[in-house]
Structures are given as structure tokens and as C-alpha cells.
Amino acid sequence: MSHSLRVIFAGTPEFAAAALAAIHGAGFPVPLVLTQPDRPAGRGMKLQASPVKRYAQEHGLAVAQPPSLRRAGKYPEQAAAAIGQLRATPHDVMVVAAYGLILPQEVLDIPPLGCINIHASLLPRWRGAAPIHRAIEAGDAETGITLMQMDVGLDTGAMISETRTAISGDDTTATLHDRLAQDGAKLIVEALVELERTGRLAATPQPAEGVTYAEKIGKHEAALDWRRPAAVLARQVRAFDPFPGGVGTLEDGTSIKIWAAIPADTKAGGAPGTIAEVTPEGVVVACGEGALRLTQLQKPGGKRLPVREFLAGSTLAVGQRFQLPEAK
């Protein structure tokens, strides 16, 4: 089926690529795709295109990669050129998903039918950069996708529609991300079909109550603080898969990445951070409340391994201790 509604798309990572693929696959014309500039990545730090750029190029879609869209920012000439390109590209609406650049009011005013954002949380909870990570870390029972009409605030626009999904006890950011990416792709296509049919989308202002912010995940957060409850640390490990991973550092300075862990059903004596049990089923570490069973680990320079395989080449032993990070 083909459509007449012309969609400029702005996005960068895999989450956004899923939405672009759905929009393009549904038959909506996409006259221009905006994505962030190529970035160095991998061991060789070679420039790599974003997932959105790769999809666009594979399907013959025009791509622009301005470093900024703010005339008053660091790249005024490139921003002015990109804004000029937007104005010169006939279109009806812009869809934005995890683009990573600020859209000033001047840009928001260009699309005749406005800018729709695909956000991976149930707004107004978890506005900001890392809503999937923070929902798992906080122990939320559910999350979802919200479509909103963009304004200049940080995820403050009026809500068009939402879809909800339960967060299971074994969900990681990776698994939840993939599920939400597909939910967002489906929801935006439904909204665009409605917009084409009626010429408008009803939107409801966000409530003032329940606002929380999902700050960007920093590498410094990876260190597990064994003084915290085991249940909290288990959520942290799930939230930080695939980035940055949980980290435990032994007293001899050996750093171990912790990719999977569950609260242990056995009591562990000893101070927080002390290894209380080492078996093929897991390494049990005492916590401030309860104990944590580590089930998937990684040595520096090694691969993620189930604990049974990890222990075949490791000397972890009962009584060893993980360092406690400096209290914040």
C-alpha cells in the first residue's frame, strides 16, 4: 500500500532504524533522512555510519548529517545549511526517534503538520536520554512507548498515544530495547495513517505529577556498590546490559564484568563484597541486604561466559573480596 503523507525522518541508533524501516516499508514517502555524523567505533576506531544511515543508503533515501541544527551553536554554517535543506524539501510531517540533536523552535516550526517524537517510556515518567535503562534500574513493573507532539522542552510535548509492556524479571536493556523498538515502529505507522486520513492528531498535555528524568548512563555508574541490597544490584546489572555492564573489582585490582546476576536464596555471611560461595551455579557475594548470585562473567579482554565456563579459567575463591566503591 502506498501513502501520500511525506515524512522527513530524524534518528540515529537501532531503535530509530526500526521506526524508519516501518514507515518506509508501509509505503510512506521519505524525502529526507537526518541522522548524526559518522562516529569512530570498534577496536580500529574507524568511522561508522549510524543504523539509520545504513538503512537509508540501502533503500536509496536522501541523507543529511548536520553536526547541529542550532544557528547559535558550535556549527552555525552547517546548521543553517541543514535548515535550508529542510525548508527546501517538500514534506508534511517530521518523525523524530533517538536523534540525539536538539531541535530548536525554528526547526519544529518547519513541518506543516509538526514534529512527532517516539519516546521509550510512559511519559511524563523518564523524560530524557536513558529511559529504558532507568525503568529497569528503578524496578518499574511496566514501561512503554509514548508518541508526542514535540516542543522545545526535554520530552515535554503533548501526548498523542502510548503502548505499554510489562518489564519481566529477566529483561535487560537489550531485550526491552528490542521489544520497544518494534512497539514504537508499529505505533508511529498507526499514527501516520490516522494523520493522513484526518489531517490532525489529538494530543493531551502531560500531567504535572509523576515527572522523572532518565539521565544518560555514565561509565562511572558501572561499579557495583556491594553495600546496597542484592535486589537493587540485580536490577542494576540487567539495566546496564549491554552498556556499560556491571563491574566488580577484586581487592587485588582485577576487574570483572558482571553480565547476569540474581538475588541468592541462600544467606551469605561476611562483609559486603565478600565471596561466600563458588559453584558452577554461581558465585555468591554478600551484599548490604541479602546476597547476589553472579551467573555470567567476563575477564578483561575475554568473552562473556556462563559462570561454569568462567570458573574453569579463574581462581575466584570463597573469602575473596570485591572492593567497595567510594560512597557517593
From Swiss-Prot:
Gene3D superfamilies given in the database record: Formyl transferase, C-terminal domain, Formyl transferase, N-terminal domain
Keyword Transferase: yes
GO CC terms of this entry: cytosol
Keywords: Protein biosynthesis, Transferase
Binding residues for (6S)-5,6,7,8-tetrahydrofolate: S121, L122, L123, P124
Magnesium keyword on record: no
Similarity comment text for this entry: Belongs to the Fmt family.
PANTHER family referenced in this protein's UniProt entry, alphabetically: METHIONYL-TRNA FORMYLTRANSFERASE, METHIONYL-TRNA FORMYLTRANSFERASE, MITOCHONDRIAL
Protein name per UniProt: Methionyl-tRNA formyltransferase
Source lineage: Bacteria, Pseudomonadati, Pseudomonadota, Betaproteobacteria, Burkholderiales
